[in-house]
Amino acid sequence: MTRGEMKYEGKAKRVYATENPHEYVVEYKDDATAFNAQKRGEWAGKGATNNAITAHLYPQLEAAGIPTHFLEKLSDREQRVKAVTIVPVEVIVRNVAAGSFSKRLGVEEGTPLPRPVVEYCYKSDALGDPLINTDTAVALGWASEDDLKRIRELALQIRDFLVPYFEKRGVRLIDFKLEFGKLPSGEIVLADEISPDTCRFWDAETNEKMDKDRFRRDLGGEAEAYAEMLKRVTREV
């Protein structure tokens, strides 16, 4: 597959056109950002680790009946995906209070939530990905009511797959962010990635953080935590 012009560069990935107008190549970078890119860093192997984790999980989600943009892993840093139009509404699914949820609502971090909480943010680096509701998304034309209904349905299906998957590997899935895209047919599919960049992972025994919070909160050991998550994700149980 020939990698063509760069279509988009985000904080953690680059997206390239290919000779097939219906497919892209996604390249994972080693860059790390936090607080809407106000804090920046990088470490060797980060992109390859996130690519490997995503490339391991997405086919399993597909097998569970959840449509994704993923086609195949091409190299350590690259994967081939279906070309989608990203819905500019990020979805956060929370199982345990943490991060901005705890700060915003005064709920102690680590408090289990009696049911999953689904939140929506407008995908805009310039505005800091502000929290929105579904009425706002529909009124401003970012997504239709049917799109949002399907997105919520898929997000909860993904949650129901991932929680026991990680539990079997000694990891608590605290919360996670998802992005969805639309195929030319109008079908909604999971896009982006599932990795320590987009999820909060805590060790099930110690509650040690094994995700980007290690960078975000200056805890150190980011590379080691990401490498450990790759080992656990790919562990046969």
Swiss-Prot record:
GO molecular function terms listed in the Swiss-Prot or TrEMBL record: ATP binding; phosphoribosylaminoimidazolesuccinocarboxamide synthase activity
Database matches in InterPro entries: SAICAR_synt/ADE2_N, SAICAR_synt_PurC, SAICAR_synth, SAICAR_synthetase, SAICAR_synthetase_CS
Top enzyme category: ligase
Gene Ontology annotations of biological process type: 'de novo' IMP biosynthetic process; cobalamin biosynthetic process
Pathway(s) served: Purine metabolism; IMP biosynthesis via de novo pathway; 5-amino-1-(5-phospho-D-ribosyl)imidazole-4-carboxamide from 5-amino-1-(5-phospho-D-ribosyl)imidazole-4-carboxylate: step 1/2
EC number per UniProt: 6.3.2.6
Family: Belongs to the SAICAR synthetase family.
Designated name of the protein: Phosphoribosylaminoimidazole-succinocarboxamide synthase
Organism encoding this protein: Deinococcus radiodurans (strain ATCC 13939 / DSM 20539 / JCM 16871 / CCUG 27074 / LMG 4051 / NBRC 15346 / NCIMB 9279 / VKM B-1422 / R1)
